[in-house]
Amino acid sequence: MTVRKNQATLTADEKRRFVTAVLSSSAARYDTFVTTHNEFIVADTDNGERTGHRSPSFLPWHRRFLLEFERALQSVDASVALPYWDWSTDRSARSSLWAPDFLGGTGRSRNGRVTDGPFRAATGVWPITVRLDGRTYLRRALGGAGRELPTRAEVDSVLSIPTYDMAPWNSASDGFRNHLEGWRGVNLHNRVHVWVGGQMATGVSPNDPVFWLHHAYIDKLWAQWQRRHRTPAYVPAAGTPDVVDLDETMKPWHDSSPADLLDHTGHYTFDTD
């Protein structure tokens, strides 16, 4: 059984294996993940179904997305699991995940270019090919947006919200999903993307490997919320236009519904509850 661990507790060998597996993914295969994520960035006013963001399926869609990536890593090294980044505890640019032997640190002040760690441009092994501008290197500006990372108290305030989601099922909704996603309230998920900066603050955010650690923690928070509340684990149940209902399969895979992904324990567990 795959066990997802807090990145702060990883051994040097576990870090090395994770980095090696990410770097061993073919560029074309990795770019598919980046492209898929970017294609599912939508606004409330866009026509058609909202699936990956600004909708109830934000959490099961990303759970399915992370499973796909984790399996890709395990095809390289079966011992690898996605670690998670608890940004409510590891809250600074000096935290262990930003070390040169893991993800590397922040970027240059003038252009955001990351200059240390295994994903820096100088290695020549991490070119950014799915991009929104001409820059072909990994960029970050840790903390540069001014607002600090979410606190544990802010996380707890969101976990206390009893209702998973509600109409209008978008970024105006006042439920757990939308507060966790960050369009309402204290702003958890979105705020972390902006804090990291660079590609993480855009639709091509999986270009930065920290994307996976961030979303593994978002997934863990969803699991914690599920254990805490007896209310329906996912809504809407059926018959809702422009969003994914409980038993409706999700694009682009068409093989999993939110109902299929409510219980993660058949795929992986976490090191702590």
UniProtKB/Swiss-Prot annotation:
InterPro entries to which the protein is assigned, alphabetical: Di-copper_centre_dom_sf, Tyrosinase/Hemocyanin, Tyrosinase_Cu-bd
Binding site residues for Cu cation A: 37, 53, 62
Keywords: Copper, Melanin biosynthesis, Metal-binding, Monooxygenase, Oxidoreductase
GO biological process: melanin biosynthetic process
Cofactor: Cu(2+)
Cofactor note: Binds 2 copper ions per subunit.
Catalytic activity: 2 L-dopa + O2 = 2 L-dopaquinone + 2 H2O; L-tyrosine + O2 = L-dopaquinone + H2O
A Pfam family assignment: Tyrosinase
The enzyme's E.C. designation: 1.14.18.1
Annotated GO MF terms: metal ion binding; tyrosinase activity
Positions contributing to Cu cation B binding: 189, 193, 215
Tree of life domain: Bacteria
Spans through the membrane: none
Family classification: Belongs to the tyrosinase family.
PANTHER family named among the record's database cross-references: TYROSINASE FAMILY MEMBER, TYROSINASE-LIKE PROTEIN TYR-1-RELATED
Protein role: This is a copper-containing oxidase that functions in the formation of pigments such as melanins and other polyphenolic compounds.
Protein name: Tyrosinase
Organism: Streptomyces lincolnensis
